[in-house]
Curated annotation (Swiss-Prot):
This is F-box protein At5g07610. SUPFAM superfamilies: F-box domain (SSF81383), Galactose oxidase, central domain (SSF50965). InterPro entries: At3g26010-like, At3g26010-like_b-prop, F-box-assoc_interact_dom, F-box-like_dom_sf, F-box_dom, Gal_Oxase/kelch_b-propeller, Kelch-typ_b-propeller. Residues 7-19 have a biased composition (Basic residues). It comes from Arabidopsis thaliana (Mouse-ear cress). It comes from the Eukaryota.
Length: 420
């Protein structure tokens, strides 16, 4: 065999690199450049599209789930729109889900939606919803006793974090503003135990602790100089305007804690129309929630009145104003099943509850979602039009007469890529 036939031609370096399973520096640069372009394109897409694109390839999955990318998308699209509501049944720990997405016309309602994680098969109870994240709890049996675990959960990505053990607390609240920080905080209103904080003043019966997702631990923030009776019914909370606000159905005020200034103040709820009216009964409607940066409040003390007032407090304000008036009479004419007779007075009442308030970019597009017997109805504030959104008949056939138009609590669902 000639020498030339034995001579092996040396392959180019880039070819050898590919054949050996590696990439040259120029190839890596090209891939990085392609990723940069792809990230630019993906960042303009809605979150529901990004969720579908996660299944395209492992590379796309890696890009979309990268915390830097997800935080960039969330911040550029804030405030994110409400995509639906979780509805808690008063009879069991199950959640129905009502979708507001236009492409969910034929599947608006999902029934018997359990919330549980792989390491805890017991159902979760939602405590609060804030900008796409849920604060949840569950009771888990361990060594002949029950422990209550608390989680921060992203229902969009199915990610969750177990908070460090919490004991002896009075109230919790979740704070998350992705336009300011990718990290969330959980605030705990706690009473002083006999063997803790012995150096604290006897007047400091309560204090606030904070858990930061970037630190992963609890720390004491500030004492609360107030009387014990202030917190008896403060079992609910809403995060609004950089502050956590605790409230209860038997109180006329909210306890507000500004997370930046660490200032504690009382946020009064709107005054009664008549001073001689009693305080709201827990069985009568009370609704307080945030939407697109503003705070909204609805209270019903007289179910025979056809006028439903919606109060608003803007982010740059400290006072309430009547934003909308809802006339229930045309709604009752179209849906006569919401007219009931109160059994102990024989008076005519309107059977309804509030699922949620949705503020859009314009007042003309904003609406309230009401729950009337067996169905959810969307009511537009400005043009006074309404339409049935979904049917609850399959969910409520076994419910008692006085409960089947009410859900115990509702929670916003916002699609988010936020990391927990």
């Amino acid at each position: 065999m000639s020498s030339c036939s034995r001579t092996r031609t040396k392959a180019p370096r880039s070819a050898r690199s590919r054949r050996n399973g590696g990439f040259s520096s120029s190839s890596a640069t090209i891939v990085a450049d392609i990723d940069d372009v792809l990230i630019q394109i993906l960042s303009f897409l809605p979150i529901k599209t990004l969720l579908r694109f996660k299944r395209v390839s492992k590379r796309w999955l890696s890009l979309i789930t990268n915390p830097v990318f997800s935080n960039r998308v969330i911040k550029s699209n804030h405030p994110l729109p409400i995509s639906g509501f979780f509805l808690h049944s008063p009879r069991e720990i199950k959640y129905s889900f009502v979708s507001l997405d236009d492409d969910a016309t034929n599947q608006r309602i999902s029934s018997s939606l359990p919330l549980w994680f792989t390491d805890h098969q017991t159902d979760m109870i939602i405590m609060q919803s804030t900008n796409g994240l849920l604060l949840c709890k569950c009771s888990c049996a361990s060594s002949n006793h029950f422990n209550t675990n608390y989680y921060v959960y992203n229902p969009t990505t199915k990610q969750y974090t177990l908070l460090h053990q919490i004991a002896g607390h009075i109230a919790l609240s979740l704070a998350f503003d992705p336009s300011r920080s990718p990290h969330y905080k959980v605030f705990c209103l706690r009473g002083r135990s006999n063997n803790s904080f012995s150096s604290a003043s006897d007047s400091e019966l309560y204090h606030i602790e904070v858990y930061s997702s970037n630190e992963g631990l609890w720390r004491r923030v500030v004492p609360v100089p107030t009387s014990p009776s202030t917190f008896i019914e403060f079992s609910y909370s809403v995060f609004w305007n950089g502050a956590v606000n605790w409230y209860g159905f038997s109180s006329r005020d909210c306890l507000s804690f500004d997370i930046n200034t660490q200032e504690i103040k009382i946020l009064p709820l709107p005054d009664h129309e008549h001073e001689d009216e009693p305080l709201p009964d827990p069985r009568i409607l009370m609704f307080l929630d945030e939407s697109q940066g503003n705070l909204y409040y609805i209270e019903v003390n007289n179910q025979s009145s056809s006028n439903l007032r919606v109060y608003e407090m803007e982010s740059n304000s400290s006072s309430w104003s009547v934003k909308y008036n809802v006339d229930l009479e045309p709604l009752a004419a179209a849906f006569p099943e919401m007219i009931r007779t109160e059994y102990y007075t024989d008076r005519r009442i309107y059977a309804f509850s509030v699922i949620g308030f949705v503020k859009e970019e314009t007042d003309a597009a904003s609406y309230i979602l009401l729950h009337i017997p067996n169905q959810a109805v969307k009511y537009n504030f400005i043009d006074k039009t309404f339409k049935k959104l979904c049917d609850f008949k399959s969910l409520v056939n076994d419910a008692p007469e006085d409960h089947f138009y009410r859900f115990q609590r509702t929670f916003q669902f916002i699609k988010s890529l936020a990391n927990v």
